[in-house]
Regions:
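Helical substrate-recognition/capping region of FAD-dependent monooxygenase/halogenase enzymes
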Residues: 1-196
């Protein structure tokens, strides 16, 4: 925690306290004020190493480990809805999510697209996002633009890599080269169920 964070959390002067209180009050309704809240890094997400709910396929050299928290990285825009996003965790909802890394959706095998579309309609749906360095790469799924390649680098992903994220935004499974036939067993494992 920095001294600036400490001063925000425990103001030393009446002016600092008035500033902090105004920021907190405005932050409830105005995004610009949220950026002024300085709470520091008061907690760190737990890495659930060796969790029986996690799976690893096709060995990675680096990236986010199964059981590890999804990093909050900048994403330019969601071109499926033309909505600016800002950061990856702002996109992820309360269900299972998938990140498919691809230079272009044309690089994704039709069998993979069919499997992911089927899983999106399953009893426990998985919503897949195509992460690409350019806009318009996805027509089947929500497209996330990783213009600088920051997200792909953090995940040690290449075109064809896939990450399955749990509802708590931790990695359930990852594939260096995605194999759709392994997705349902990995999802069952993440749910604590025996694979069929």
């Amino acid at each position: 925690i920095t001294s600036r964070t400490t001063n925000f959390l425990a103001p030393k002067t009446p002016v600092s306290r008035a500033f902090r209180d105004a920021v907190l009050q405005l932050a409830a309704d105005f995004p610009f004020a949220r950026a002024l809240v300085n709470s520091g890094r008061l907690s760190t997400a737990t890495i659930h190493a060796d969790s029986p709910l996690s799976s690893e396929f096709n060995g990675f050299d680096g990236g986010v480990l199964p059981g590890g928290p999804c990093p909050n990285l900048p994403i330019a825009a969601d071109y499926a809805s033309n909505r600016p996003i800002g950061f990856l965790l702002d996109v992820l909802g309360g269900g299972f999510q998938g990140l498919l890394f691809a230079g272009d959706e044309a690089e994704v095998a039709p069998a993979t697209i069919a499997a992911l579309r089927s899983l999106a309609r399953a009893p426990v749906p998985v919503e897949t996002f195509v992460v690409s360095q350019r806009s318009g790469a996805s027509r089947q799924f929500k497209g996330l633009v990783d213009a600088e390649g920051t997200t792909a680098k953090a995940f040690a992903a290449q075109s064809g890599s896939y990450y399955l994220l749990r509802p708590d935004q931790h990695v359930a499974a990852r594939w260096r080269n995605f194999d759709p036939s392994q997705l349902e067993p990995a999802l069952a494992r993440a749910l604590g169920k025996p694979a069929a």
